[in-house]
Curated annotation (Swiss-Prot):
One record GO biological process: positive regulation of mast cell chemotaxis
Secretion signal span: 1-26
Pfam families linked: PDGF (PF00341), VEGF_C (PF14554)
Record's protein name: Vascular endothelial growth factor A
UniProt lineage: Eukaryota, Metazoa, Chordata, Craniata, Vertebrata
Tissue expression remark: Expressed in venom gland, heart, brain, liver, skeletal muscle and kidney.
Localization, UniProt: Secreted
Keywords assigned by UniProt, alphabetized: Angiogenesis, Developmental protein, Differentiation, Disulfide bond, Glycoprotein, Growth factor, Heparin-binding, Mitogen, Secreted, Signal
Compositionally biased tracts (Basic residues): 145-161
Domain of life: Eukaryota
GO CC entries: extracellular space; membrane
GO molecular function, one term: growth factor activity
Subunit structure comment from the entry: Homodimer; disulfide-linked. Also found as heterodimer with PGF. Interacts to the FLT1/VEGFR1 and KDR/VEGFR2 receptors, heparan sulfate and heparin.
Length: 216
């Protein structure tokens, strides 16, 4: 009789244990989600993450290799260390001051023709600084020259020069490297010519500005 009661006792204990384990496994972890949603990131952490520094950035390969338009590249983008972040003055921009190259293997495909893995070199940034923007430097240089008093005629000539292209809308958000733009008229045209495409046994698609395989 005692033996039977002992087995019943252990059986009930085992059932209770497995039942509680399933309940705990099915229930969401209380506190973790609430803590993440209500967490306030400290100011210094936010500030340190925003400063100008090299950060991992996904870069379109065609941005660095615009002449490879006849190929399909896989992957089409790569992770590189590039300068990013904020500067405390709108007249400054985050630019690289130290560079180095890294070589990566990229697959190059020609539809219905061939495919091969090819080493390609990419530039990475190891050090960044906040420095005056290009248009800011132009304004500062013109102001410095005017202060030296080179004559009213030369002042007027310098004053007429403005970097017009800063007001032009980009030709294409995704494929800027395939277009060239007139800084005065903002007119867009294909960077590659039909003769260049034909030299590679391709033809120019004027809509996409890419060298493509001739249609039959």
């Amino acid at each position: 009789m005692n033996f039977l009661l002992t087995w019943i006792h252990w059986g009930l204990a085992a059932l209770l244990y497995f039942h509680n384990a399933k309940v705990l496994q099915a229930a969401p972890a209380q506190g973790d989600g609430d803590r993440q949603q209500s967490e306030v990131i400290p100011f210094m952490t936010v500030y340190e993450r925003s400063v100008c520094r090299p950060i991992e950035t996904m870069v379109d390969i065609f941005q660095d290799y615009p002449d490879e338009v006849e190929y399909i590249l896989k992957p089409p983008c790569v992770a590189l260390m590039r300068c990013g972040g904020c500067c405390n003055d709108e007249a400054l921009e985050c630019v690289p001051t130290e560079l180095y190259n890294v070589t990566m293997e990229i697959m190059k495909l020609k539809p219905y023709q061939s495919q091969h893995i090819h080493p390609m070199s990419f530039q990475q940034h190891s050090k960044c600084e906040c420095r005056p923007k290009k248009e800011t430097r132009i304004i500062q240089e013109k102001k410095s020259k005017r202060e030296k008093g080179k004559g009213q005629k030369r002042k007027r000539k310098r004053g007429r020069y403005k970097p017009q292209n800063f007001h032009c809308e980009p030709c294409s958000e995704r494929r800027k490297h395939l277009y060239k733009q007139d800084p005065l008229t903002c007119k867009c045209s294909c960077k590659f010519t039909d003769s260049r495409c034909k030299s590679k046994q391709l033809e120019l698609n004027e809509r996409t500005c890419r060298c493509e395989k001739p249609r039959r």
